[in-house]
């Protein structure tokens, strides 16, 4: 159980690897859904590859069903944007926009058109992040 709990935490935190700066480290339900979408099948794989550690067939069947249900519900949650209203939308979009800035700044782009596009992306995403943060402060 500790292994699974730590794995979920690590997967959630890893979702933030793509943010441009720590100012966009904003917890949100969409990243949690994505962590669950990764965690559930990995938990199944772990149980399948370590069968000697999981010797209770009834418990194993229950866990497989639980992990499958978590995968299904988290997948539906992210696709349907369950529990995402104004605040969660903004909290999800800020790290998303931050990732676009990071990619534009760090990618080895050589094409002049793509470089120009990245300049526009950086400017627009920074402006939109500032706007979203301001809206969040008012709500």
Q: Where do the language-model regions lie?
A:
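Alpha-helical membrane segments of multi-pass proteins
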Residues: 1-139
């Amino acid at each position: 159980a500790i292994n699974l709990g730590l794995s979920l935490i690590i997967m959630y935190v890893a979702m933030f690897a793509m943010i441009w700066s720590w100012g966009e480290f904003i917890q949100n339900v969409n990243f949690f859904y994505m962590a669950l979408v990764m965690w559930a099948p990995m938990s199944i794989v772990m149980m399948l590859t370590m069968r000697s550690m999981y010797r209770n067939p009834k418990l194993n069947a229950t866990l497989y069903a639980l992990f499958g249900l978590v995968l299904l519900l988290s997948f539906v949650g992210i696709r349907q944007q369950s529990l995402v209203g104004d605040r969660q939308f903004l909290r999800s979009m800020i790290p998303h926009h931050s990732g676009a800035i990071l990619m534009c700044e760090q990618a080895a782009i050589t094409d002049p058109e793509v470089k120009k596009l990245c300049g526009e992306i950086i400017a627009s995403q920074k402006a939109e992040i500032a706007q979203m943060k301001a809206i969040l402060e008012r709500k």
